[in-house]
């Protein structure tokens, strides 16, 4: 509703762990749009369990949602992205990773940090491959933010988490929006293959503690 004043915003539900649903999503967009300027790969999942009892489905669900979906969505949409990109102003793909894919998290969410490290490396690999097609590919690595995925953690450990962040607060939507706008704008036309932490300094604090 907030975006309606800027134009039509269409929701297309899809299970991005399934190739046929990715294809259906692409087909719907392709029928309505001649090109695509920006693709944000933001679907995500996490799973928590202790090491000795971590289940296979907890591994597969997270990897399929966080990694597989990025590769195949980008693959499907690459031709639409090519149509809008130029040498001076490429089209953009923004992948959402995590600082847990850079540093070592405390929580027992084994498939999650592994998947986000994969997202960061996939970002670099695709950036190298698709630069010649006038497509910039970068990633944002958020730290602690208020989100559905973080709700239970914040209920239990919010004060501890805030104290561990050098900026002494939890991230807000405007923090992520600012990073995404930068990576979508002319200001980042000469930037591809980076992973941008948006974490209030959490990573440097972790390294200092080590």
Label each PLM-derived region with a short phrase.
Residues 107-108, 132, 139-165, 175, ...:
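A glycine/serine/threonine-rich, flexible loop-to-helix segment
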Residues 79, 128-129, 189:
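Alpha-helical segment proximal to the catalytic Tyr-Lys
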Residues 98:
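Residue(s) in the substrate-gating loop at a strand-loop-helix junction
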Residues 35, 131, 136, 191-193:
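Short, small/polar-rich loop/turn modules that mediate ligand/substrate recognition or access, typified
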Residues 50-51, 55-63, 161:
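Substrate-binding pocket helix/loop in short-chain dehydrogenase/reductase
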Residues 181, 192-210:
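Short C-terminal tail/terminal secondary-structure segment
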Residues 74, 115, 123:
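Active-site helix of classical SDR
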